[in-house]
């Protein structure tokens, strides 16, 4: 059947990348189709039941600032919230939400089903319709043809997916779901640069068989933080504890004894696993000097006894899993509900993508999520939103948009993937961002919401809330600049009494806030401020980090000069005098779009960038005089 409706955007896959891609395109007014193999698994958390964390929550906030769904779903489904790095600087603080899988998934599905311009259809996609070098649509498992101006692929671990438990293996996209074999074969036919990666998940445990009394409880923060700029604590369901226990030498001996049947250590798995989320057998091997490793027992939801033992991801045979779980303190009688497993899947070298996440080889075809070599819900959601918005803009022949490294962690993510490529699952960290003081979790809305409004991603309600917040920041900052404390006036005396600090001369409230040990809460009490915690936080950070932020702005100005120098798509690196063969080959492989991108390619020296710049200028001069 040839479906009668022609779509602007078709999104294949209903995971974290696919849902954000479909929602973004639909919010922008494009006729959008979301194809999923199973409507019941839309927004499913296939691995750990959590959103956020170091570097990751920055991405979630950016998705949220652009009108995305992930942060609000985390607020509606979160059963424990914590601020990580709370004693460190604002740049590296991160929010983490332990999520109820069912509630999170329900929140995502509700958002999808109530989004205008979005159709959902349950069918696996088996083929892409490509005419010349342009995608024209999709063919499903039943042979239904859907036509579209653009297609976004967000296939997760489903492309050629193989599940491993010990030396046993079976085809699967994840436990209980079939893989995407036909589509994987079709993509290989298109001569895109394909590789194999792997990820894994731990066995799930029945909480009724665990002795929590010998474990360390890990409560959430109080007052509870929120994930979304539009979130409220009233959205949160009941809050619960997680628990911490540890592996021991007995556990490690059991694991070592099973390595001869490990698919990782017998060469059965060829794909590379995530460096920063290693399996327990990998930890024992890589950190052989450690006597124990932490295990976090995380509830999977309020209406289930299922626990996620974070820290013991494994693909060892089930009998070894059984023994290693029962060797851990408090889990001596643990009942395993589901075995752990590893999954191996196809991914495509992201260096074959443009910065918009469109493939260089096929016009109108976009990739987002694990297909690009990343790991994590947050990384997937960020790519999905960018791919969806750019597919939407291309469909209407509008200029596409991708944030720069100084604008967003999304920009860092895309630039890293396309400039450096990846041979292992890529995870975001704050350390990857050179301008992280400007790219804080708390100011994602200030960086992106105005842009999102211009792109059509941000609705009236979010825009009004953002404008109200920024007006409040401006008003309160101005007020505090005109409130004065002096050694002999009542406010000055109150300040000294309250803080025990010295006050030798007249100071504005803003000047007092600049002091290292003074916080906005104290200034609010001193001056009778009634602004929200969010507004107070913005004022405090802006005041305390002003000098550092200004210095980063100067660094960004220098970078922008390089960013503004575009490298023509057909630039001939062979004619650049003085470039080594090695550097020439690297530049020809990556095909950087700007001098700034060229400077970030490993092995490309500043001198080489200068040579390219001189050649570009010579070419431009020649064209002008011709």
Swiss-Prot record:
Cofactors that this protein relies on: FAD
Cross-referenced Pfam families: GIDA (PF01134), GIDA_C_1st (PF21680), SAM_GIDA_C (PF13932)
Organism domain of life: Bacteria
UniProt binding sites for FAD: 13-18
UniProt keyword annotation of Electron transport present: no
Residues reported to bind NAD(+): 273-287
Sorted UniProt keywords: Cytoplasm, FAD, Flavoprotein, NAD, tRNA processing
Localization, UniProt: Cytoplasm
UniProt GO molecular function: flavin adenine dinucleotide binding
Cellular component terms (Gene Ontology): cytosol
Biological processes, Gene Ontology terms: tRNA methylation; tRNA wobble uridine modification
Chief location bin: cytoplasm
Function: NAD-binding protein involved in the addition of a carboxymethylaminomethyl (cmnm) group at the wobble position (U34) of certain tRNAs, forming tRNA-cmnm(5)s(2)U34.
Family membership: Belongs to the MnmG family.
Quaternary structure and partners: Homodimer. Heterotetramer of two MnmE and two MnmG subunits.
Name of the protein this chain belongs to: tRNA uridine 5-carboxymethylaminomethyl modification enzyme MnmG
UniProt source species: Acinetobacter baumannii (strain AB307-0294)
Organism classification: Bacteria, Pseudomonadati, Pseudomonadota, Gammaproteobacteria, Moraxellales
